């Protein structure tokens, strides 16, 4: 059944994201070990780049020691239409959907309804006897296949070790067989057809041997639907979004939310080529993809980040047990799985990977600052977030700025936030 992203307002669900600023305690930067003068550099850099036409606008939300330090909007929500950015602007968060879907699955795990070691074929039998592309003398995949040595598991979906890939992230024979990405696939296939398509394709790698980016979280979302008997968005709304007060987060965009939706610049600032103007608002989703089809606000997503940093608790509500969160945030790759995270996000090369997100395993080596245990995962449309439990720091940065520039701003925002910590 086709689900349109543009739906009628559901009574009581679509409250303004600015409510968050009222119910989270605020603090002056100096009260939580940060410098107002240094934090102001974020706005200075963003305003200069907005004026130079590099990005349309941005919203940044920062919390430290459980208190809101900054919730600021800069530039344009829709520059072409002359609409200014506001803190309740809604963004396509793309792969920032993945950690939320992982949390939704772990809730089923805590109820005994889903096991991390379950084979995917338990829920979708067509994945029972997968084939893997054979390699030629140069190590390149060929049209020949060999049997998978073991089943794909739920853990493989969560940590991107299933061998199932995104077609748009390579040029091999196998990549050309796969859909390009989550958004494209969700507009081309319904859930059943999507499962049939992926189950018919060879894996690029044997399961549990290589981290490579792909459709694992989309399949996890469909697994959640099968277990819960609900659409993914409906399940996450009841179990995650509503308990956290994430009232502007979901897969369905109301008319009110569409009016608050951030749009990219008409042309890519680097190449000058036209950019897609938010096709997710006009093209129907045939299934709610767990890999990248949600929208949210900076303040909503900050709630989610802080819940994980607070070991599964938000106020009086406990969404996950602390040991489940610790397991989610632990490195799931180890020494025997080849780590290609840097191919998906060069700024997170040398990170480890937990369940649904990257985890930092060293204070150095990586291109960005952060403590061991920092966790994150960005979105290809220009959004990013991270939480650093050691620093009690959570940051969400949102901009409608797809393309290679997003890697630049991930590093810029990281540097500008950490340099403002002075305690």
What are these regions, as identified by a protein language model?
Residues 385-386, 392-401:
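Short, well-ordered beta-strand elements
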């Amino acid at each position: 059944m086709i689900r349109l992203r543009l739906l009628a307002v559901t009574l009581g669900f679509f409250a303004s994201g600015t409510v968050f600023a009222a119910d989270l305690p605020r603090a002056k930067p100096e009260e939580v070990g940060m410098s107002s003068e240094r934090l102001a550099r974020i706005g200075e850099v963003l305003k200069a780049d907005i004026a130079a036409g590099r990005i349309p606008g941005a919203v940044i939300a920062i919390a430290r020691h459980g208190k809101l330090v900054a919730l600021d909007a800069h530039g344009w929500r829709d520059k072409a239409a002359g609409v200014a950015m506001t803190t309740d602007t809604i963004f396509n968060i793309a792969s920032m959907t993945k950690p939320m879907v992982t949390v939704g699955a772990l809730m089923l795990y805590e109820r005994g309804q889903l096991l991390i070691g379950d084979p995917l074929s338990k829920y979708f039998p067509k994945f029972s006897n997968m084939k893997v592309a054979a390699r030629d003398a140069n190590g390149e995949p060929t049209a020949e296949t060999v049997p998978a040595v073991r089943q794909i598991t739920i853990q493989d979906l969560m940590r991107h070790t299933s061998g199932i890939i995104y077609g748009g992230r390579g040029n091999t024979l196998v990549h050309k067989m796969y859909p390009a990405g989550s958004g494209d696939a969700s507009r081309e296939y319904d859930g059943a057809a999507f499962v049939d398509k992926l189950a018919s394709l060879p894996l690029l790698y044997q399961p549990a041997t290589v981290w490579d980016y792909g459709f694992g979280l989309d399949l996890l979302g469909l697994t959640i639907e099968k277990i819960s008997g609900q659409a993914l968005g409906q399940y996450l709304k009841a179990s995650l979004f509503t308990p956290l007060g994430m009232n502007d987060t979901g897969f369905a965009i109301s008319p009110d939310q569409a009016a608050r939706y951030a749009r990219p610049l008409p042309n890519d600032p680097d190449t000058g080529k036209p950019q897609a103007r938010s096709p997710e608002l006009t093209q129907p989703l045939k299934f709610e993809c767990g890999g990248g089809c949600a929208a949210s606000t900076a303040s909503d997503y900050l709630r989610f980040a802080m819940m994980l940093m607070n070991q599964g608790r938000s106020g009086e509500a406990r969404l996950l047990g602390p040991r489940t969160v610790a397991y989610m945030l632990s490195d799931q790759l180890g020494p025997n799985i080849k780590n290609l995270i840097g191919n998906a996000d060069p700024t997170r090369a040398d990170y480890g990977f937990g369940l649904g997100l990257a985890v930092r395993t060293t204070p150095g080596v990586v291109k960005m600052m952060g403590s061991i245990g920092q966790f994150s995962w960005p979105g290809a449309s220009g959004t990013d977030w991270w939480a650093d439990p050691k620093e009690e720091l959570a940051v969400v940065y949102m901009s409608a700025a797809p393309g290679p520039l997003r890697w630049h701003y991930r590093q810029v925002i990281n540097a500008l936030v950490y340099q403002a910590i002075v305690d």
